[in-house]
Regions:
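Electropositive, glycine- and tryptophan-enriched low-complexity nucleic-acid-binding patches
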Residues: 34, 38-51
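Conserved phosphate-binding loops in nucleotide/dinucleotide-binding enzymes
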Residues: 21-22, 26
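Conserved polymerase palm-domain catalytic core
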Residues: 1-11, 15, 47-59, 63-188
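Short, charged, low-complexity patches
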Residues: 28-33, 37, 94, 146
């Protein structure tokens, strides 16, 4: 039977001098994760909202910047929020992610497989540590899982707020855990 292996923890420098932890999956895990990602993308790509750009097929950073430029210049944008969800990948709730995944995935085997990867732990300097939260940056499946989480936890909420409560025009562009919202009205 297939067993998920712990990710190997390495660190790479961030532009601000701090270190970003990456989780490098074993080759077997990468292969199985790629197969799962292919299946899950077919399910979730039809659900993801148009203002989500990060780590999606056929979408790029340049397209996100173009969408932001068009939104800010073509609409009356007077106020901007530029946000980064600090430590998002490292602190993502497994419990909430699994709840979100269960909305669209009925196959218990797929759900158990995803849970195995989330709980496989990390190996750093030969020591294994459990993972109770987070999804390793560097794993094949992590960007898609992050997009699923943010689709339910952020995108749907923002879309609902924008259509029901916003007084003026609102521009939204999200790339992974970074997003920009432009408002016409300060009260929004």
């Amino acid at each position: 039977a297939y067993r998920a292996k712990p990710s190997k923890r390495i660190y790479i420098p961030k532009p601000d001098g701090r270190m970003r932890p990456l989780g490098i999956a074993a080759l077997e895990d990468k292969i199985v994760q790629q197969a799962a990602r292919t299946v899950l993308e077919c399910i979730y790509e039809q659900d993801f909202l148009g203002f989500s750009y990060g780590f999606r097929p056929g979408r790029s950073r340049h397209q996100a910047l173009d969408a932001l430029f068009v939104g800010v210049t073509k609409q009356k944008v007077n106020w901007i929020i530029d946000a980064d969800i600090r430590g998002f990948f490292d602190n993502l709730s497994h419990e909430w992610l699994m709840t979100f995944l269960e909305h669209r995935i009925a196959d218990g085997r797929m759900l158990r497989l995803l849970k195995k990867w989330l709980r496989a732990g990390v190996s750093e300097d030969g020591e294994w540590s459990p993972t109770k939260v987070g999804t390793p940056q560097g794993a094949v499946i992590s960007p898609l899982l992050a997009n699923v989480f943010l689709h339910y936890a952020l995108d749907l909420w923002i879309q609902d707020w924008r259509t029901r409560q916003a007084i003026g025009e609102v521009t939204i562009v999200r790339y992974a855990d970074d997003f920009v919202i432009g408002f016409r009205e300060e009260s929004d």
